[in-house]
Amino acid sequence: MLRCSLGLVKHGLTGMTTSTPPTAPAAKRLTPPTVAARAHQIIGWLHQRRDRLRAHGVQQYFKHEVVSLGIATPALRAFAVAQSKPLTAAWGLREATALCDRLLQEPELEVRGMGILILGAFRRRFRPALARAGRRWLETRLDNWALVDSFCGSVLSPLLEQHPGVEKTLRRWSGARCLWVRRAAIVTLVPFARHGQLLETVYELAGEHFADPEDLMHKAVGWVLREAGKTDPRRLRAYLCRHGPAIPRTTLRYAIERFPGSERRQLLECTRPSARGAPRGGASRRA
C-alpha cells in the first residue's frame, strides 16, 4: 500500500513496533484510567505534534478531503505501543472497545487510527460480538481506505483467526450497500489468502465484485487475488482465464503483478473483452 504519514495499514497479523517515544506521557499502572481521561490524553498528545506541512502531503493519497495531523509514522506507532502496554494490563475488551469508539468520533486520521491500533493490542481477548461494533464503525466512522484497511489488519483479521465463524459474517458483508463494509469483507481475507487459507471463500467473494461500481473494490479484489496466487499461482491463473472478460481491468492488473512479464501480457490479452459492452459477472448488493 502507499506509504503516507498515517502509516496504519497492516498487511498481516503481526504486532506493532516495540520502541517507545521519549516524549510520550507516562501511563499509570496503579489506578486504571477512565476511558474519557485516556481519550483526552491521547487526543492532546497527538494534537501537540501536528505537522501542517506533512499533513498537507497526506491529501494526495485520497480522492476526497481528509483531516490529518501529519504525524510521522514511527512516532505514531511508538505512542500506540506506549499506551497499549499498560492498558492491556489494566483494562478489559469492554474498555478498549469504548476507547476506540470514542477516538473514532474525532475527525483526524491519526486519532481514529490510534483507537484502532490500541484495540488491536487486545486481540487475544476478542469475541465474535466485536463484529457488530465493527460494522457500525464501518458504516458511520471509517470513511476512507486507509482507516478501513488498518481496521481489517489490526482487528478483523485477528478476530477471524480466533473465531472462524466470523467468516459467515464476512460473506454477508460482501453484499452490503456500504462500500466500506464490502471492502472490509475482502481486505480482512488478505493475510489468510497470503498463506493459502480460506481460498474457497476468497475466490467466491472476489467473483461477487466484478460488477461492483466502485474502483476501490476492484483494487481490493485484485489485491486479495494477488495474495492468493502467491501460494497457488496455477489456481489463480485458471481462475482468471475462466472468468476472462468479466474481470475489471484494474482487478486483473493487481492480480497478475507477481507473474512474469510475458505471462502478464498473455493474461491481459486472453481476458480482454472481445467486444465493447461485454457483460460482467457479479452479485447485486444484498444487505
Per-range role (PLM):
Residues 17-287:
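Alpha-helical scaffold domains
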Residues 11:
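Cationic, low-complexity basic patches in intrinsically disordered or flexible, solvent-exposed regions
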